[in-house]
Amino acid sequence: EADDIVGTLVLKGRKPNERTLIISSDKDFIQLQMNENVFQYSPVTKKMLNGVDPHEYLREHILRGDKSDGIPNVLSSDNCIVDGIRQTPMTKKLIKEWEESSIPEKHRERFERNTTLVDLRYTPFHLQEKILEQYKKEPIGSRNILPAYFTKHNLETLTKNIGDF
């Protein structure tokens, strides 16, 4: 998935403290903002995606799962989405309770399953190697084309902040 590529490049393919801008509306990338100098811009809303604690967002995403990626919440069986079975509802109250205490043992295995599937730090090593190998082969493009691209696509926020990247 593209998530694995972007995640690997942010986590392993950049210099320490290098400012990195992810241009995507995909909220799966919010977790990458745990890393210093990582920012996200949504071309759909034409706004920076910030103001959400990336640690809290990741934990809730792990608990709730991601139906669009076929990942059920931690209360539901592995195959419920594939088999079209309704998931057991994951309430805000329960998420809050589990923030303040540990995940009950009976849900621990599913929590670990979802962590592996949702947390981009768990992208399989062999995929990370392939991603980085391919990335290093590609020539680095010129930043000189960015202002014209941003202007053409009405990306005013990015145009104003281009000096940051």
Model-based region annotation:
Residues E1-K160:
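Extended two-metal-dependent nuclease catalytic cores across DNA- and RNA-processing enzymes
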Residues G163-F165:
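Short, amphipathic C-terminal "tail helix"
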